[in-house]
Amino acid sequence: MGNAPTDVPAALAGLSDQPRVRDFLARAMVEGRLSHAYLFVGAPGSGKHEAAEALAKCIVCPNGGDGSCDECRRVAHKTHPDVHWIFPEGASGYVVEQVRSLIADVSLAPVRAKAKVYILDRVETLRESSANALLKTIEEPPDGVIFVLMARTADACLLYTSDAADE
């Protein structure tokens, strides 16, 4: 991992229980090397949602993730129009219409920020046909679109390829 970055955005500083994740994301922010997709893996309560929220704040905040501005508050309340939290709607996972809607939305310009963030929870519940449709979008998103995928295990995630997302 190297040395921890000295200028950690306030939104990421709250990830003190996950120093490797915090430092990795802070370094990417400071160096301007954000990936187009991230895969956060862990059991419920492991901090995936907190890390996804912190990263989204850094991406849409005009102050680089200060954690206290209106944009950051909107992300925290899940009301920011450019940060899309997507959860499985069906009893057995994502429904096809969710994936179609997401793919259609990706090409639209951001409303308030310079980029859009799509946070998909429990991606291991995607069915193969939905995962395949979404994979092309995740591998080749338009400029200014970042995906954060969350799963309990990488093995169960049909979307995961080492080329598609930074783990």
Question: Where does each model-flagged region fall?
Answer:
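Short, well-ordered alpha-helical microsegments
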Residues: 127, 157-158
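Short amphipathic alpha-helical segments
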Residues: 131-132, 159
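Structural recognition of the conserved hydrophobic beta-strand(s) that form the central parallel beta-sheet
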Residues: 119-120, 146-151
